[in-house]
């Protein structure tokens, strides 16, 4: 790789961070501060019944996740045929359009349609395409690069609630959503249009040789390792999704009783702390075996989730701090290990399928959590026991992956 391309790959990293910060921040991580005012307004105008208000919020988030999984498969197919830039520009259009529709919604059906568009955008501009983009530019130091890139999801989740909460309090949720949508059209779309490109020169660098090595998606799905990996991804995303989307509502429930501003700060802290987990895990995975690092991160996530068995306002930080580090690291290593285990020959398609499995686990988690909260009068205590159970199963799944990968290496000798 010539010196110019070695430098430009860090421009690609910056664009990927920006893409994830805006796309995941506006479609997923930054939305929880909007939930309470949306819920209250829709109940007040009769758009939804108060008895299923929590389910309405959970369904909205579930739609985003489920559609993002389906669109990730489609996005992987388009990437292999059209390249990354046009696919990512389409993602901007879907995201910006979905947010504008949502800001004008006055019925549950319109909200669901808007969240569907926002979810579809993630298959074209979210984690999977950004991982593919960066993986094309990096071989040596790929774990560190991905660790940096995937902090974008946390940066968006940390920054947007801090900006949105005071704006919502002063101007209302609709104006705030329109204002935040401008970042898609004025910043992200031009940056992708003018700066995103793929490596143009072939060299003898390992990154160029490895780009065509690995399994097809058909070969990957016939291995036990793929399905163990998929099960782990689904189990990991159950607690990640529920905590990132519904923990803010748990904190504001009568049992915990914190203010909306304090809950928004806790939400931002969750994402901000996960930045350290993502960067640390990415760096460690370049120095030690990545699967060992992921086992450690998933163990930390499970240990933190035990605090949920007796959560109070006073001990909530004992959950948030280690859980954020653990989930941030596990999230990064799922993306890295997909390329390590199955190669980069059809990594876009493979990541698309894995994303679909991930969001299925997330959607199940959101659905169960919202349902149990409604059944208990808005109390999330029992609903969040599911986070502890899923975290325990995710840890066991990482041990299974470790064993299967070790066996595959032994058979290759």
Where are the model-predicted features located?
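Conserved MFS/SLC helix-loop-helix module at the cytosolic interface between two early adjacent transmembrane helices
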Residues: 70-108
